[in-house]
């Protein structure tokens, strides 16, 4: 499979069309401050067991604070055969989009 980057304004469409599992990969304290409705918190870890927490049968939408860590995670999962979407600008851009 592969990974794709999406704009925050496209999250709802991807969630509806692809029935993705939304995963906030930030630390729990950041997740508690703000998270996308319905997102689960699974903090990113560079070890190989982190990938095993997900099913390859359901697309994933990952986000972190600014988009860089989720991009690394999406690349890693994409190489492992997952269909992954990551949000450009991360949670910061998602919150900004909501304010508009």
Model-predicted segments: where are they?
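Rhodanese-like catalytic fold shared by cysteine-dependent sulfurtransferases
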Residues: 1-21, 27-59, 65-100
């Amino acid at each position: 499979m592969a990974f794709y980057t999406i704009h925050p304004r496209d999250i709802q469409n991807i969630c509806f069309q692809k029935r993705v599992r939304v995963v906030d990969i930030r630390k729990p304290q950041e997740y508690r401050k703000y998270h996308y409705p319905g997102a689960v918190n699974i903090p990113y870890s560079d070890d190989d067991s982190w990938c095993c927490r997900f099913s390859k049968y359901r697309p994933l939408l990952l986000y972190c604070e600014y988009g860089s860590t989720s991009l690394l995670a999406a690349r890693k999962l994409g190489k492992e055969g997952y269909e992954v979407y990551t949000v450009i600008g991360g949670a910061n851009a998602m919150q900004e989009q909501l304010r508009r």
